[in-house]
A protein has these predicted regions:
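Generic structural signal for hydrophobic core residues of well-folded globular domains
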Residues: 68, 72, 155-159, 179-183, ...
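C-terminal charged capping/lid subdomain of soluble metabolic enzymes
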Residues: 77, 185-250
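Intrinsically disordered or highly flexible coil/loop and linker segments, enriched in small
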Residues: 74, 78, 110-114, 134-141, ...
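Short alpha-helical scaffolding segments that buttress acidic/His motifs in well-ordered protein cores
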Residues: 65-69, 121-135, 176, 196, ...
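Active-site segments that bind and position negatively charged phosphate/pyrophosphate groups
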Residues: 81-195
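A glycine/threonine-rich phosphate-anchoring loop and its flanking beta-alpha core
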Residues: 2-90
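A short secondary-structure junction motif
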Residues: 68, 72-76, 108, 131, ...
C-alpha cells in the first residue's frame, strides 16, 4: 500500500531515503535496513519547519553536504568512465546541492532562528530531505555514504554515551574531515571546518567529549579499515591512519 512521511525536522533525509537506520536501546548503531523503493509522498508543514531549532537545520545541511564528499571516497574526482551511471548521477546532484548550501545555508539558519519562512528556508528544506533522499535513491542506497557516515556509526557504537547529546549531521561532519583527507584533499579540511564553525558545529572528536587518545580509537580505526568502504590494502591502511588525525587536529 502507498505510504507517506510527515517530517517535523530537516535534520536528516531519513523521511525520503530508502532505508531505516536502527539503534540499540542504549543508542549504539545497529545497522540499517535497505529498501528497493522510497515512500510515495512526503508532506512538510513549513510553518513547523521554519520554527525548529536552527541547530537541526544546520545538522541536516552538513549531512547533505556529506554526500558529495563521501561519494568520492578515496578518489580525487568522479569521472563517468570510472563509476556506474547511478553513482555519477548521484554525484552530479550532490555537487549541485553542495554549491547551493554554500550560498544559502547561513541565510536559511538565520531565518529559521527568527521563525521566518523564506525562499532560503524552503530551498534548504528541499535539499536536506528531498534531494539528499534522491541522491540515496539513484545510487540504490550504496556509494553515497562512506567513511564520514561510517565514522558516525562507529562513534555511536564505541562512544555511545559521549555521542548522545549530538545530532547525526554534527558527527558526520567531523567524520567528513577524515573523508576529505582520505580523498587526497587535506587542504580542503580547513575551509570545511571554517564552514562548520560558522554554523556553530562541533569541529573535532574532543568537541563532542571524546578523548582522541582513548584506546577505543584503535577500535574505531580497525572498524573503518575493515568496513565495506575500504579496500584492505597496505596503501589504504597508511592513508587512513594519516587521515585519522583530522578527526581531532584543529
Amino acid at each position: 500500500p502507498p505510504s507517506g512521511e510527515v517530517p517535523t525536522s530537516i535534520a536528516t533525509c531519513a523521511a525520503f531515503a530508502p532505508l531505516s537506520v536502527m539503534y540499540t536501546a542504549e543508542g549504539a548503531s545497529l545497522g540499517s535496513l535497505r529498501y528497493d523503493h522510497e515512500v510515495n509522498a512526503i508532506v512538510m508543514d513549513m510553518d513547523v519547519i521554519c520554527k525548529e531549532p536552527p541547530r537541526y537545520a544546520a545538522s541536516g545541511i552538513m549531512d547533505g553536504m556529506a554526500k558529495m564528499i563521501e561519494i568520492q571516497n578515496g578518489r580525487s574526482e568522479i569521472l563517468l568512465d570510472d563509476v556506474s551511471i547511478g553513482l555519477f548521477t548521484a554525484y552530479t546532484i550532490a555537487e549541485m546541492a553542495y554549491h547551493v548550501y554554500e550560498k544559502e545555508a547561513h541565510q536559511a539558519c538565520h531565518d529559521i532562528a527568527e521563525g521566518k519562512l523564506t525562499k532560503a528556508v524552503e530551498d534548504i528544506a528541499y535539499l536536506n530531505v528531498a534531494v539528499a533522499g534522491i541522491v540515496s535513491g539513484v545510487s540504490k542506497g550504496f556509494g553515497q555514504t562512506a567513511l564520514g557516515h561510517e565514522t558516525y556509526e562507529l562513534v555511536r557504537t564505541h562512544f555511545t554515551q559521549e555521542a548522545k547529546p549530538y545530532l547525526h549531521g554534527e558527527i558526520v561532519a567531523i567524520g567528513d574531515c577524515l573523508q576529505l583527507a582520505f580523498n587526497g584533499h587535506p587542504e580542503q579540511v580547513a575551509p570545511f571546518r571554517d564552514f562548520m564553525r560558522s554554523m556553530n558545529m562541533p569541529l573535532t572528536l574532543e568537541d563532542i567529549g571524546i578523548d582522541s587518545n582513548s584506546p577505543k580509537m584503535e577500535n574505531l580505526f580497525q572498524d573503518l579499515f575493515h568496513s565495506p568502504f575500504m579496500e584492505p590494502t597496505a596503501e589504504n591502511e597508511a592513508r587512513l591512519r594519516k587521515a585519522m588525525h583530522y578527526l581531532s587536529a584543529d
